[in-house]
Structures are given as C-alpha cells and as structure tokens.
C-alpha cells in the first residue's frame, strides 16, 4: 500500500518513465522466451527483409536481427545495472571513508577523485579499454573504476552535512561502531544514492554503446552498441530503407532507455 501511495504521488512523466524501465527490465529477464532464434544462429539467408519468419529481417551474416535486439536487452540492461550499482557503491564507500577517517583521508581521497575528474570520463574509459582485454567483465571494471569520482564528490558533501547532525554526533560520542554511524547516515543519504544509481546506469549504457561502436568492447557480446556498429558497417544501409529495420531499432532502444533514466531523476519545474 505504501508503494502504491508513493507511485500515485509521482508525476505522470515519472510514472511513464518507470513503466518504460519496467518494460526494459522484464524484456531483459524474459528475452530467452521471446527470442525466435539464438543470437549465435547465423544459418538464415543474409539480408532478408522483415517478414513473418524474421520480424526485423536478417543481417549480412544471417543472424535474426530481432533476436539480436532482444539479446541486447539482456546484456546491455544487465551491464547497466551491475556497473551502476558498483560505481555508486564504490563512490559512496569512499565518500564515507573520507568523512569518517578524518582530514588526512579526506584530503587524499578528494585529491585522488579530482585527478580522475581532470579528464572526461569517456576519454579515459576508451583509452584504458583499448589496452585491456576486450571482455564484458573488463568493460564493467573500466566503467566502474573511472565513473565513481562524481558520486564521491556529491555524496561526500551530503555526508559532511549530515555527520554534524545530532543523531550522528550522539552515536560518535557514545563510541558507536562504523556500522552504527553508517546506519544513522543512511536515511539522509539514500535519496541521493538512488538518484546516482539511476544516473550511473544511464552513463554505463552510453559508455558501453560507445565502446562497442568504436570496436573496443567485448567482440563476443551481442549488445545494442555491437548491433549499431554492424549496421553502420553495412555499405548499403541506406539503400531500399534497410536502415529502418537494421539501424533504427537498436538506436531507438538505447535512446529510449537513456532518456527514460534521465527524466526519472530530473526535477520538474
């Protein structure tokens, strides 16, 4: 009941965004049930137009594009959730350590975060990804390691404001444990963490798509970025409206997902 009450209080825009994101999540979970063919099956005739047997046709290798798109939901959404959760958790933990351990730790971690923020995240991520082994695990690791500083900076400021409050100060005075202090801080910090998790998922999809598009992602992962790259490599993409069923679906999947995440955490005027 409490959850329903909270949903009713949301604006129409945010409810639409939540519905879209729920659709993405369910599609990612249930994709194997709806995929007519395996994403690795290339036994079909190449470059078939959309029809009853292939809703979005086939690519140059004979893969069913609809199956590749659904598989992209699985891989890209899972990668976004894992990368978003880990980068948010890492940034929040380091922010807590900076505030809890004192001035020396705060200065060191803040300087370290500022060092990462000098160069745009995407530039650093692409540079490191070029030299790392092209696996999905390394893609997640690179995204997490180079996208936590912004989380750290904002959450650190929030914790500094909250740690001077009476509840936390009383816990510190009574020699409470680290977990006791964290428990007192969590209610005040949780809304910021939730917003950052959504934003980090947003960035993870954009970064993975960019890495796959430029050929430095996992070559075996059937993601939306990989499908977009394959479509762009097809020399006759814009002949006979091929782009409408080859390029537009994965681009639309990325754009709708990213925009829905962004609008979900954007304050309305």
Task: Label every model-predicted segment.
Residues 77-90, 179-211:
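Transmembrane alpha-helices
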Residues 31-34, 79-113, 126, 267:
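Transmembrane-helix boundary motif in ABC transporter permease subunits
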């Amino acid at each position: 009941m409490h959850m329903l009450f909270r949903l009713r209080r949301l604006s129409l825009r945010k409810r639409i965004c939540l519905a879209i994101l729920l659709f993405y999540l369910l599609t990612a979970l249930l994709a194997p049930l709806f995929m007519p063919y395996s994403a690795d099956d290339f036994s079909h005739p190449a470059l078939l137009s959309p029809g009853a047997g292939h809703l979005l046709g086939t690519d140059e290798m004979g893969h069913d594009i609809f199956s590749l798109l659904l598989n992209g939901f699985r891989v890209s959404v899972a990668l976004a959730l894992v990368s978003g959760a880990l980068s948010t958790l890492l940034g929040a933990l380091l922010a807590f350590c900076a505030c809890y351990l004192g001035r020396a730790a705060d200065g060191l971690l803040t300087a370290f975060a500022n060092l990462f923020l000098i160069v745009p995240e995407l530039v650093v991520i692409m540079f490191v990804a070029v030299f790392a082994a092209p696996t999905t695990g390394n893609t997640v690791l690179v995204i997490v390691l180079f996208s936590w500083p912004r989380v750290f900076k904002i959450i650190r400021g929030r914790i500094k404001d909250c740690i001077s409050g009476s509840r936390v100060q009383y816990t510190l005075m009574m020699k409470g444990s680290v977990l006791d202090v964290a428990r007192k801080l969590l209610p005040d910090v949780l809304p910021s963490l939730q917003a950052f998790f959504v934003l980090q998922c947003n960035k993870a999809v954009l970064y993975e798509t960019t890495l796959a598009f430029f050929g430095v992602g996992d070559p075996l992962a059937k993601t939306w970025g990989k499908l977009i790259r394959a479509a762009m490599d097809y020399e006759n993409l814009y002949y006979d409206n091929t782009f409408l069923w080859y390029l537009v679906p994965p681009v639309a999947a990325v754009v709708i997902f990213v925009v829905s995440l962004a609008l979900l955490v954007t304050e309305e005027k």
